UniProtKB/Swiss-Prot annotation:
This is Thioredoxin C-3. Keywords: Disulfide bond, Electron transport, Heme, Iron, Metal-binding, Redox-active center, Transport. The keyword Iron applies. CDD domains: TRX_family. NCBIfam families: PRK10996.1, thioredoxin. It comes from Corynebacterium nephridii.
C-alpha cells in the first residue's frame, strides 16, 4: 500500500498489516497517518490524491463561512477516530482552481475520493455523529463494490 506523507509529499510503501503500528515517513520521519486533518492546496493536491491508496475525505471550506467554522471541530474529531482515512481541508478562497475543479456550489462540501475518483459528496455542516454515520455508509458501499 502506498501512503503519501502529508508533511513532505514522499511516497511510502507500507504493508497493510503495519498500518496499525502508526508508521512514520521514511524521508521526514513524521507520522504517515495523522489523526488530524491535513491541508491540501493547488501545489500538493495532485501528488497526494493520485498516489495515496487510502481514501481521502476532503472538506472544501472558506474562512468567512460560519457553518464551515462550526463543522471544523466535528471534522477533526471524526479524523481522530478514523486512522485509515485521510482527512484533508481545502480552503476554496486560497485555491480557486481546486474549487472550480470540484464544481463547488455551496460550502462546506465534503468529497470522498478514492485516488482520483470522487466516490461520494455531501454539502452542509454535519456534527460528529452525522459525519461518522455518513462516512461509514460510504466506506461500506465502497467495500461492496
Amino acid at each position: 500500500m502506498i501512503i503519501v506523507c502529508a508533511s513532505c509529499g514522499a511516497k511510502n510503501r507500507v504493508p497493510e498489516e503495519k498500518l496499525a503500528v502508526h508508521p512514520n515517513c521514511g524521508q521526514c520521519h513524521q507520522a504517515l497517518l495523522p489523526l488530524e486533518p491535513i491541508e491540501l492546496n493547488e501545489q500538493n493536491f495532485s501528488n497526494f490524491i493520485s498516489n495515496s491508496d487510502l481514501p481521502v475525505l476532503i472538506d472544501l471550506w472558506a474562512e468567512w463561512c460560519g457553518p464551515c467554522k462550526m463543522m471544523a471541530p466535528h471534522f477533526a474529531q471524526v479524523a481522530k477516530q478514523n486512522p485509515y482515512v485521510v482527512f484533508a481541508k481545502i480552503d476554496t478562497e486560497a485555491n480557486p482552481r481546486l474549487s472550480a475543479a470540484f464544481n463547488v456550489r455551496s460550502i462546506p462540501t465534503l468529497v470522498l475520493m478514492n485516488k482520483t475518483t470522487e466516490v461520494a459528496r455531501i454539502s452542509g455542516a454535519l456534527r460528529t455523529l452525522e459525519l461518522q454515520q455518513w462516512l461509514d455508509q460510504q466506506l461500506q458501499q465502497q467495500q461492496g463494490n
